Amino acid sequence: MSTFPTPNMALTTILVVADIERSVAWYRDVLGAELYREYGESSAVFSFTGAWLLLVTGGAPTPDKPDVEFAAPIDPTTVDHSFTIRVEDCRAAYGTLRERGAEFLTPPYDWGGEIRCFFRDPDDHLFEISQAG
C-alpha cells in the first residue's frame, strides 16, 4: 500500500476563466502571481504564495471526467469557493492591490479579531485578504 499524501505532493487549484489572455494579465499584474507556464490559448499555470493556480478556459466532459463540464462563474452574488490570503497588514495590501487595479467590494472592515476585505478577479472568483486582529 502506498503512502498518501507524500512529502512532495502539491495542491493545484483550477479556475475556469472566460478569456485566458485577460486573466493571465490580471493574475500577473494585479495579484502579483508568477507565471510558470502557458499552454496556448487554453490554460496557464501560476505560482502564488507556495500554491499553484491553473487557469483554464471552459471545457466539455472528457473520458476521465465524464458528465463534468468546466465553466466560468455565472452569478457573482453566489459563491461556491473563495480564496483567503492571510497578510500581516490588510490595509496596506488593500492599498497595493487597488493601485494595481483590483476592484474591492468594500474597504477593509475591522471585525475586532480580524480585519478583512474582498475583491474579485475578472471572472468573479472571490478573493479575501485577511489580517488577524
Functional labels for PLM-detected ranges:
Residues 1-12, 34-85, 92-120, 131-133:
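Vicinal oxygen chelate
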